């Protein structure tokens, strides 16, 4: 009996030592319970931004948790990003905008053609008057807010105009939510020129921090508990342009003659108001 007890103790001791000496690697499940620490700084729009202020860290912590633990929507955003970032990124580069702005339509619409309660539409969420101001066609037949390429170009022009007005890309991002006039007014009466030095309304005060949280998670998904090997990403749409010189009387027949159907035509031409 004594020998048996001694053997059990030796076995337990050996197991304990082997466990202590063995390096325990983080798993997806452990990461989900313990998110990585917030970095002391981040490169945003090509500039180093300090994240050491306690208030900023706590507010950013909230946005990281909100997105890291909202698995269904964050995974869906990753799937959609694989389809739409190849469209957005070349336009940003051509317009000399930082590549980070590809995350903005995730904040605005989760990369979906949606309509807000206020009436903003499309991936970049343009209101009708703002969309027309930035050269988007919006009428009874066409709504280019639903066209990713054209809406992205319009967003680039808005952001460049905003930066010229408020001075930095960070404030230009806030202006995309608050409006250029609203940010300029806040800057004036608060005598401030930096986003993190300003007291803003609830939505705008969270806007850039949500942007940073999305950037951190999308650029380091495994660190935040997303196993990219198991996520099936959406492929970019394969399309071709067809010139039309005259009105089309029967869209269903026109589509059929080109080897597709009306359903596919509607899917890829959401910015057209198609009627029977």
For each feature predicted by the language model, list its residue ranges:
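Substrate-binding/active-site groove segments that recognize
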Residues: 119-140, 152-155, 159, 183-186
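Catalytic cores of secreted or luminal carbohydrate-active enzymes
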Residues: 202-225
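Catalytic and binding regions of secreted/periplasmic enzymes and modules that target cell-wall glycans
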Residues: 159-186
């Amino acid at each position: 009996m004594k020998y048996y007890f001694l053997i059990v103790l030796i076995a337990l001791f050996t197991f304990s030592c082997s466990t202590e000496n063995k390096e325990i690697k983080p798993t997806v499940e452990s990461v989900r319970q313990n998110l990585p620490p917030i970095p002391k700084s981040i490169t945003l729009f090509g500039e180093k931004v300090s994240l050491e202020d306690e208030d900023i860290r706590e507010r950013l912590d909230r946005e990281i948790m909100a997105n890291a633990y909202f698995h269904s929507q964050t995974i869906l955003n990753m799937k959609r990003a694989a389809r739409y970032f190849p469209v957005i990124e070349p336009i940003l580069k051509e317009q000399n905008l930082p590549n980070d702005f590809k995350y903005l339509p995730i904040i605005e619409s989760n990369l979906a053609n949606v309509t807000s309660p206020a009436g903003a539409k499309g991936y970049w969420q343009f209101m009708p008057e703002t969309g027309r101001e930035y050269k988007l066609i919006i009428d009874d037949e066409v709504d280019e807010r639903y066209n990713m390429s054209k809406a992205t170009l319009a967003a680039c022009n808005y952001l460049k105009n905003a930066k010229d007005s408020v001075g930095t890309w960070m404030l230009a991002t806030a202006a995309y939510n608050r409006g250029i006039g609203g940010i300029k007014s806040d800057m004036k009466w608060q005598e401030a020129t930096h986003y993190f030095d300003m007291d803003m309304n609830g939505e705008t005060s969270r806007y850039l921090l949500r942007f940073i949280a999305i950037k951190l998670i999308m650029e380091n998904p495994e660190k935040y508990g997303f196993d990219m090997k198991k996520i099936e990403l959406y492929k970019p749409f394969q399309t071709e342009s067809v010139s039309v010189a005259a009105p089309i009387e029967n869209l269903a027949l026109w589509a059929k003659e080109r080897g597709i159907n009306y359903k596919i035509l509607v899917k890829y031409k959401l910015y057209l108001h198609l009627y029977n």
